[in-house]
């Protein structure tokens, strides 16, 4: 099985105040973490629907304190969600607040699944992973997917000045190394994923919310605050 990225406790100190810290950084957008999480998951659901795909099992890789798991369960209408994270404190909080028969959480060190999931969702994780460990991490995700399974890779877009500003205001992003869309494409292709589509979202802050209906026609312009690469695990 591919090697998991090294366990790090750095995020443990942010677990209790993670959303407060991130919301402070997001203040310039006029929105909070829930707005962006909901937008990501709904966009993923829309993309899967266009592909006539209905995943039964979903892995939330780098789930943090687990707040996206209920959104994935509801919007993707899947049967189960498993969240994994390298932060033991975050997983403890997720299990205490959100675990249910359909939603479970594990520390990354305890995660050993192979060929088990129909879809993997991963948001804003790779800019925290050292360059030398990124391909191993993608291979780990690939091995967790069933052949033909879908990987929804979300990252902050370094080509967006607003994104760079928000990250500069976020305490736990101070050591982040951003992942460009072109770099992500190369990494995913090297790991054996077939790219299905790339979309760019979150162009307008709340102050320009009246322009947000335009975002659905801007998704191929590489300037949105975040991007999603939707790809498929090849059969071999």
Language model segments and positions:
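Short alpha-helix
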Residues: 177-192, 198
């Amino acid at each position: 099985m591919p090697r998991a990225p090294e366990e790090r406790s750095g995020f443990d100190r942010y677990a209790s105040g993670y959303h407060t810290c991130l919301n402070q950084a997001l203040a310039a957008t006029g929105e909070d973490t829930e707005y962006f999480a909901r937008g990501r998951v709904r966009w993923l659901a829309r993309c899967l629907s266009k592909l006539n795909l209905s995943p039964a099992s979903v892995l939330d890789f780098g789930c943090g304190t687990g707040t996206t798991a209920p959104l994935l369960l509801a919007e993707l209408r899947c049967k189960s969600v498993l969240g994994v994270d390298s932060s033991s404190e975050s997983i403890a909080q997720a299990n205490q607040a959100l675990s249910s028969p359909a939603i479970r959480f594990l520390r990354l060190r305890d995660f050993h699944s192979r060929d088990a999931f129909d879809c993997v969702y991963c948001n804003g994780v790779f800019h925290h992973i050292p360059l030398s460990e990124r391909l191993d991490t993608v291979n780990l995700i690939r091995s967790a997917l069933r052949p033909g399974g879908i990987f929804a890779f979300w990252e902050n877009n370094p080509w967006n000045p607003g994104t760079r500003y928000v990250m500069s205001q976020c305490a736990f992003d101070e050591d982040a190394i951003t992942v460009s869309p072109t770099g992500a494409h190369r990494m995913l292709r090297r790991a054996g994923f077939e790219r299905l589509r790339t979309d760019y979202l979150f162009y307008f802050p709340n102050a320009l919310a009246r322009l947000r209906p335009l975002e659905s026609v801007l998704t191929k312009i590489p300037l949105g605050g975040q991007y999603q690469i939707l790809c498929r695990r090849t059969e071999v």
